[in-house]
Swiss-Prot record:
Major site of localization recorded for this protein: secreted
Name used for this protein in its record: Glucan 1,3-beta-glucosidase
Gene name for this UniProt entry: EXG1
GO BP terms, alphabetized: cell wall organization; glucan catabolic process
Alphabetically ordered keywords of this record: Cell wall biogenesis/degradation, Disulfide bond, Glycosidase, Hydrolase, Secreted, Signal, Zymogen
Protein's job: Beta-glucanases participate in the metabolism of beta-glucan, the main structural component of the cell wall. It could also function biosynthetically as a transglycosylase.
């Protein structure tokens, strides 16, 4: 959930033909060519993120520093031990989401959910501290989708060794995913996911399997990542002789070059129903945080224009309404906010005190959030749609679809516009 900021005044070049129909061996339940996903991410459920559910982590905080606070799920389970960790996480898995959430999503116009899950839910490495039991609740979530007329992506959010070093991969500050043994385990996990969720038992609900969330291209071997994508595709497409027809989702790996993936895994090479996943935030870069609201909007609109001309079907699988990085632990346990000058020697912009609770937001800030949200909705629907990150949090309102909707800052209905035609499409 980190890392993209493109210069807003970058000229959009290399225009190519609009996406063409992708070869389908069998009609998909979802029409990626013509329909729009309007979805939310179920963040912080099966992969812990301290800023989404700080209550799970704050028991170690003394109010002055975070020295004893685990920084991710790996260290959370390691610190507790398997028995206590399982007890606490079972309580979390069974309560953080209920069917009432899914019913409310449907009521608000949501038609799909993206469900992050780590490799450790399916297979453990030797000496892994992680605990298992998530799959039962994943199955329950898919049944709740079925009951409420929602579709789902199953998203492999964390790979062994970590693919990006983010806390949301399960293991922070590690980049060892491309070690041979870790790639092997990741492919085995994809085979397991594909065999169960890519087959006929779930084809009415699961409309995509994401091979890996946010591999950090700038620190990875991109040739190796491309090979992994091809191998992962094969693991799901042809699983013990049973062919899966589901959409295969590949993340863009934060490659900033326009149309980077256009010539990869194309129909002409025998690949079909491939979708590219883009994630867009404008708060993880000092220059982005300092932009005027008009420039935030222009950036989002430019992304929408660029994505519209890509060769592959594509979705914006993560985005938010955030204009600050003020949410506690958003940048990781032990890190402050760039906005307040408490992260990596960043210059001070403003205090975070008025941004961490909706009740403290000024009318001007609420207007800016609504404008920015509407512009992003318009931009992402230039292509195949979107998944907002995320449905709910404990105390991070800029990232909380439920809270923002209740405050009138996400449109209801979703196509309502107080600030129409901001992108000029």
């Amino acid at each position: 959930m980190l890392l993209t900021f493109a210069p807003i005044f970058l000229l959009i070049s290399s225009i190519v033909a609009a996406p063409t129909l992708q070869l389908q061996r069998k009609g998909l339940e979802w029409d990626y060519q013509n329909d729009k996903i309007r979805g939310v991410n179920l963040g912080g459920w099966f992969v812990l993120e301290p800023y989404i559910t700080p209550s799970l982590f704050s028991v170690w905080s003394n109010g002055e520093d975070d020295l004893n606070t685990p920084v991710d799920e790996y260290h959370y389970t390691q610190k507790l031990g398997k028995e206590t960790a399982l007890s606490r996480l079972e309580a979390h898995w069974s309560s953080w989401y209920t069917e009432a959430d899914f019913a409310q999503m449907k009521y608000l116009g949501i038609n799909a959910v993206r469900i992050p899950i780590g490799y450790w839910a399916f297979q453990l490495l030797d000496n892994d501290p992680y605990v298992q039991g998530q799959v039962k609740y994943l199955d329950q979530a898919l049944e709740w989708c079925r009951n409420n007329g929602l579709y789902a992506w199953v998203d492999l959010h964390g790979a062994p060794g970590s693919q990006n070093g983010f806390d949301n991969s399960g293991l922070r500050d590690s980049y060892k995913f491309q070690d041979d043994d870790d790639v092997k385990v990741t492919l085995e996990v994809l085979k397991t996911i594909g065999a169960k969720y890519g087959g006929s038992d779930y084809e009415d609900v699961v409309i995509g399997i994401e091979l890996l969330n946010e591999p950090l291209g700038p620190v990875l071997d991109m040739d190796g990542l491309r090979q992994f994508y091809q191998d992962g595709y094969s693991e799901i497409r042809n699983n013990d002789g049973v062919e899966s027809y589901n959409a295969i989702i590949i993340h863009d790996a934060f490659q900033q070059t326009d149309h980077y993936w256009d010539n990869f895994m194309q129909v002409s090479g025998g690949y079909w129903n491939v979708v590219v996943d883009h994630h867009h935030y404008q708060v993880f870069d000092q220059a982005a945080l300092e932009l005027l609201i008009e420039d935030h909007i222009k950036t989002a609109c430019n992304w929408g224009t660029t994505h519209k001309d890509e060769a592959h079907w594509n979705i914006v699988g993560e985005w938010s309404s955030a204009l600050t990085d003020c949410a506690k632990w958003l940048n990781g346990v032990g890190h402050g906010a760039r906005w307040s000058g408490n992260y990596d020697n960043c210059p001070y912009i403003d205090s975070c005190l008025s941004y961490t609770d909706l009740s403290g937001w000024t009318d001007e800030y609420k207007t800016n959030v609504r404008k920015y949200t509407e512009a992003q909705l318009d931009a992402w629907e230039q292509v195949g749609g979107w998944f907002f990150w995320c449905w709910k949090t404990e105390s991070a309102p800029e990232w909380d679809f439920q809270a923002l909707t209740n405050a009138g800052l996400i449109p209801q209905p979703l196509n309502d516009r107080q600030y129409p035609n901001q992108c000029g499409y």
